[in-house]
């Protein structure tokens, strides 16, 4: 006989007796009957971010929310956050109305809502003043968001801990995040120590954010067990992308080691470089013996059809088909699948420039596959030299851009690190937080040569508060600050996009871009004459002699 202490995570599968007893003597046979309960979250926001540029409109979100509820398997839904509000503004839509409309149905039935929060950068790609970050939590709580998933791409706790405090003050649940990657530095013990610090600072949950899907399953299992051993009451939520193909193994590993909640997606946006589908995850865990909720398949098919309708309506024109494909090549470079679309667009311009240079030198042109492999190899070269920053927004973009520019300047005979902007240098110099590893000597020497200074100053102390200036701008323009100051918040968080939105130009620009995308898609299927006839259906098409 062996003595076990019963943790609340095991649920009540062997009766009320286990519930009321703190410690009992039981056999291994009884232990095997106890099923760990696993809950699921639908990352509806991230499904779209990892697939394309835009998010569904308010009316579309309001239509799908009741269907998600009817599926009966989701304890949580990711409703908003980074890459949600900004793209709403770019489409000429009000993100505050969208967040309220999407959160409300879930709030009414007790499904928790959560948002993505970039810590120091909040909802954008560059640092945000303290007073604007504080306001964000008050606004999001008022709009119906329960949980904020706070991350720093560098895992610098200085960028996360203030947000934990402000989120708690606003009544939100702060979920602190570990950005997962695979490097000699990023061990289970390294991450566990960060989790200890974040939990001591007030984090109520921990998210393992495997944004590129390159976290090794064994490491993720070991890390989960370490955190649960040290903090048995802390909820652990796993978020893993499916791009490189490790995600299902990782889900099984973290669940077998104590994880509580798994992020999932639904068709037609699951898999590829997005997330595993709820059906597959539920089936695997159910057959492994976990206590998981059943899926209402009629509602699943309805949600699937609605999501496809949104794609066909307009969102699909901004989705890169390559994001539907998995790729083991991602394991080497570590880039997240969600940025592959923008990366391929950037690569196209460099590809043409490099091939022109090669032709001038009498060398054979490269295929796009050749260029892609060269870029992945260059990212592998650059990444350790810039200190192994986890490749998540914005550091994935910075690292990729350094590698991309290197390919061009190497071809030009100028060497590496010639075309680096202030944002790239800011990461290297420590202005965004502490880099996990060592910066390469050649970059340190280049910084000295360019009179750039490294810093270890707490990043958020470098910014002055800014709300008073934005309040004045709202007043001067005759703009209302909005319910719970939500319009003031949008201006302060996304000043450039909000001003264009208020001018009406955002909607005009978006509609022009949409028409251009539709024309481009039609143009691949129709002749010039057919395209003209389609666009002017009631007119007689004329063809020049």
Model-predicted regions and their roles:
Residues 270-293:
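C-terminal helical cap(s) of enzyme catalytic domains, especially alpha/beta-barrels
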Residues 69-87, 322-545:
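Terminal or standalone catalytic/regulatory effector modules within metabolic enzymes
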Residues 47, 150, 206, 258, ...:
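Conserved, mostly hydrophobic/aromatic
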Residues 193-194, 245-257:
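Catalytic cores of alpha/beta
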Residues 66, 81-194, 212-216:
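Active-site beta->alpha loop and helix N-cap motifs at the rims of alpha/beta catalytic domains
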Residues 210, 257-274:
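Glycine-rich phosphate-binding active-site loops on the catalytic face of alpha/beta enzymes
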Residues 39-44, 75-79, 111-118, 148-149, ...:
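Hydrophobic faces of well-ordered beta-strands that scaffold small-molecule active sites
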Residues 4-5, 9, 13-30:
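Short, positively charged and aromatic/hydrophobic N-terminal segments
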């Amino acid at each position: 006989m062996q003595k076990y202490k019963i943790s609340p995570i095991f649920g009540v599968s062997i009766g009320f007796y286990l519930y009321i007893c703190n410690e009992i003597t039981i056999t291994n046979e009884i232990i095997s009957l106890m099923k760990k309960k696993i809950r699921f979250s639908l990352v509806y926001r991230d499904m779209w971010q990892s697939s394309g540029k835009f998010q569904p409109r308010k009316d579309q979100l309001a239509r799908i929310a009741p269907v998600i509820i009817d599926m009966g398997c989701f304890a949580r839904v990711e409703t908003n956050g980074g890459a949600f509000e900004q793209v709403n503004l770019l489409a000429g839509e009000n993100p505050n109305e969208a967040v309220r409309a999407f959160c409300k149905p879930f709030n009414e039935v007790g499904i928790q809502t959560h948002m993505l929060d970039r810590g120091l950068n909040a909802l954008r790609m560059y640092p945000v003043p303290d007073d604007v970050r504080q306001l964000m939590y008050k606004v999001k709580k008022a709009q119906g968001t329960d949980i904020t998933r706070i991350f720093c791409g560098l895992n610098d706790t200085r960028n996360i801990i203030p947000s934990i405090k402000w989120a708690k003050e606003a009544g939100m649940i702060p979920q602190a995040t570990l950005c997962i990657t695979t490097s000699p530095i990023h061990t289970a013990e390294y991450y566990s120590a960060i989790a200890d610090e974040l939990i001591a600072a007030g984090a109520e949950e921990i998210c393992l954010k495997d944004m590129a899907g390159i976290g090794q399953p064994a490491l993720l299992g070991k890390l989960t067990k370490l955190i649960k051993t040290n903090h048995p009451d802390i909820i652990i939520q796993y978020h893993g992308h499916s791009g490189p193909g490790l995600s299902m193994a990782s889900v099984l590993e973290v669940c077998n080691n104590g994880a509580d909640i798994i992020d999932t997606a639904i068709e037609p946006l699951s898999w590829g470089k997005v997330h595993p589908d709820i059906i597959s995850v539920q089936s695997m865990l159910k057959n492994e013996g976990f206590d998981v909720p059943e899926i209402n398949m009629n509602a699943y098919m309805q949600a699937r059809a609605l999501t496809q309708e949104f794609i066909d309506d307009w969102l699909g024109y901004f989705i890169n088909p390559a994001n539907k494909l998995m790729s083991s090549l991602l394991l080497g470079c570590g880039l997240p699948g969600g940025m592959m679309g923008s990366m391929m667009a950037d690569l196209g311009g460099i590809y043409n420039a490099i091939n022109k240079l090669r032709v001038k030198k009498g060398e054979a042109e490269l295929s796009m596959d050749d260029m892609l492999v060269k870029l992945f190899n260059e990212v592998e070269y650059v990444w350790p030299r810039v200190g192994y920053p986890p490749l998540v927004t914005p550091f994935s973009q910075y690292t990729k851009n350094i590698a991309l520019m290197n390919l061009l300047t190497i071809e030009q005979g100028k060497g590496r690190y010639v075309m680096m902007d202030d944002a790239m240098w800011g990461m290297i110099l420590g202005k965004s937080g502490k880099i996990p590893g060592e910066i390469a000597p050649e970059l340190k020497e280049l910084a000295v040569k360019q009179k750039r200074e490294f810093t270890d100053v707490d990043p958020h102390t470098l910014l002055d508060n800014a709300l008073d200036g934005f309040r004045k701008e709202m007043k001067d323009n005759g703009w209302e600050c909005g319910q719970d100051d939500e319009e003031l918040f949008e201006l302060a968080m996304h000043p450039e996009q909000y001003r264009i939105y208020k001018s009406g130009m955002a909607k005009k620009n978006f509609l022009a871009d949409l028409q251009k995308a539709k024309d481009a898609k039609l143009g691949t299927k129709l002749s010039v004459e057919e395209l003209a006839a389609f666009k002017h259906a009631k007119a007689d098409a004329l063809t020049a002699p």
